[in-house]
Amino acid sequence: MNPPTWLRGRLGVLLSLGPACAVETLPGVPGLLLAPVGLWLLFAAPVLLLRGFTDKVVSTRSGSLLLAAGLAVLLDILVALGVNTVLPLLGVERPLTRLVLASATTLVLLVLGILAPQSRRPLLRGAPLSGARPVAWAAAGALLLSVAGPIRLNNGLGGAVSTTALVVVTALIVLLLLRHARCSPMVLEAGIYAASATLLLLTSLRGWYITGHDIQREYLYFRLTLGGGFWDISAYTDPYNACLSITLLPVSIFRLTGIEDIYVFKAVLPLLFALTPVLVHRAVRNVASPLVALLSAVFFMAFPTFFTDMPFLGRQAIAFLLLACAMLVLTDSRRPLPLRRTVFTVLLAGVVLSHYSTIYVIVGTLATAFAVDKAWRLASRPGRARAHRAVGQGRTRTFLTWWTVAVPAVLALLWAGPLTHTGGQLESTLRVVASDLFGSGDARGGSSDTRYSLFGGAGVTPEERLAEYREDTIGYTRADRADGKYLPLDALAKYPTPVAEKENLPLTPAGRALDTVGLSVPALNGVLRQAAALLLQVLVLVGFVIALRGRKSPFTPVRDQITLTVGALAMMGLFTLVPQLSVDYSVLRAFQQGLLFFAPFIAAGALWAVRRAGRRAVPVLCVLVAGLLLDLTGAVPKALGGYPAQLALSNSGPAYDIYYPHAEDRRAAMWLNQRAAGDDLVVQTDRYSFSRLQTLFTVRTQDSVHPALLRSQSYVLLGSTPTRKDEVTVFFRGDLVTYRYPRDLLDTTRNLIYSNEGAVVYR
């Protein structure tokens, strides 16, 4: 008798593990073979073996696969952490090698294959694929352009291909909206993934080296772990080093797949994060119509932080992936509640290991939601019946309980405290927050990102922020300045540092045509961005109100979605009103995280707004979504001009100036590192040149060249942007400020000892 199909598939996975492990342990295996084998061991095989378990946690086929993918990522982290913890006790000094990781992964998968329940659901057979052909063509075109566009820009060519990719992504999303009733869920989710991956890759693939902000430091700690073959938090007690999503996980991927290390960060991690909008869709689809679920995923992708910041935040990307898996578990009420609560808590434990700030915000959100739920129940009148549809689809038993809140909180405190000793930033933030709340602080404003909030103020001007920065630097260098370690203030008075003018793209023919009729294109672009930010917030509130009323809501949220949305909005309000929180954790990133909870309310608000269009409601919605996407992704400003260039579309603009790595900078850094190796002088460079070059320096380095911080004796390296444009950017209290740099100060007080027509070094 032939075994059933599900057993044959499971047996095939188990039989593949031995040959895969053998390939990993053989020397000289070509990368074309090593990469698919490593990806199989790390992701594909765990997903297939975990399906039987995830089938018991969530009820849908795609939901089971998505949850298995999130658990596979968490499993990879835990396997690497396990060998890193246990093997040194047995005398193995370098446990993070390919041999050890491949053997441990294979052993864990064998145990998983034997002990885990077996899935009786076919993987793909019988899955409906209605509407697949047009979606497949649009998705393939978008993904192809997402790679071709950055390559052209990296080679010094124009951004037309990348702009076309944004147009194709928008067309793909409009196609999904128009055909959502005729497309199967699998086709919709494949289209969402293609759109998500395209938006992320257009940014993440920029530059031939590591490009971005936080990713530079993430890559540094990854390299330190990789070089030592061992993760040791005591060697570098830094919160970044405590994020296993950017240390152990990338090391496992690099070791087992042979993918070049920079592309682990530039491609593999973004492609994993691209699953998050799909998870948003699947989670919302458990409680809402296909249109509401699709819109929720679209609004999550359309928020600018998704495609401008998240490609440079590997640790937060993995944390968001696991949090989205947790929301999938929360909204699928067709499976046993105790099991779902346990898996939810395990996923949040994975967030603890992945990113410190994300789990702190989650704990605050959960605690607020739990309190709101208790207050809601106390305020409800027993036996009171509602005349219309009940919020929560009649299910009154809530998902959140005291231990689903307490366990992640305790784990976060343990991880940041006695286990890694990296909680100093949290303690510092809480002290400043307490000072702000009780009126003993310096009363300075928070990040200017709060100006996008409905409840935010006007923000701080660049001139005011730069003056604060200069005042701070003079204050904490006063004693050393008196000892002659820094240049005297009277000498600095001759060299002002005015704020640089904002550089916009030149007006295109279309932009000039608008300008001739009296319409200011720069003002129009600014108004559109501000209006988009306010629109999303208004839609959240509108959707929330109509969901509570129940009658006209396009979807009926479960009770926990309502309380979690209250918690997320409360955290947003706290970040807006308490300055230090907006400085230490971006308000825009907090909103992106909040979208995992309240995206369906935005969708409900949008559907309510177009309800009077009747049969034309979906086409009107398509126009609204297309306009929002084209504007926020930068396609409209690129077509009109009059707005700062975006990194994904141009070789200019503020992001390009401070994040893009140049070969000239690297050559200057390597030369200076050799020159200063035997010298006692510190190397000074600006913050963003240091960020791009920190993996090359082994000498003492200071990441500021502001005149008030220039030492009397030091090396000074000016990167490409300060050299070519005489501009330097600082990041202070949550804001980027670019000022004109007085190069004549260096020409007067120092000697030029190196120049390569892109970067210079003074002594």
What are the residue ranges of the model-derived segments?
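Membrane-embedded, hydrophobic transmembrane alpha-helices
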Residues: 1-185, 580
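Transmembrane alpha-helix segments characteristic
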Residues: 13-21, 189-197, 536-541, 549-579, ...
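Active-site lumenal/periplasmic loops and adjacent helix-entry segments of GT-C-fold
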Residues: 38, 157, 176-190, 194-321, ...
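Hydrophobic/aromatic-rich transmembrane helices and adjacent perimembrane loops
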Residues: 39, 43, 161-168, 316, ...
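Membrane-interface helix-loop-helix junctions at transmembrane boundaries of multi-pass membrane enzymes
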Residues: 178-181, 337-338, 380-399, 511, ...
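Membrane-interface transmembrane helices that cradle and orient dolichyl/undecaprenyl
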Residues: 323-340
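Membrane-interface alpha helices of multi-pass inner-membrane proteins
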Residues: 329, 341-359
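Extracytoplasmic
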Residues: 427-498, 502, 520-522, 551-554, ...
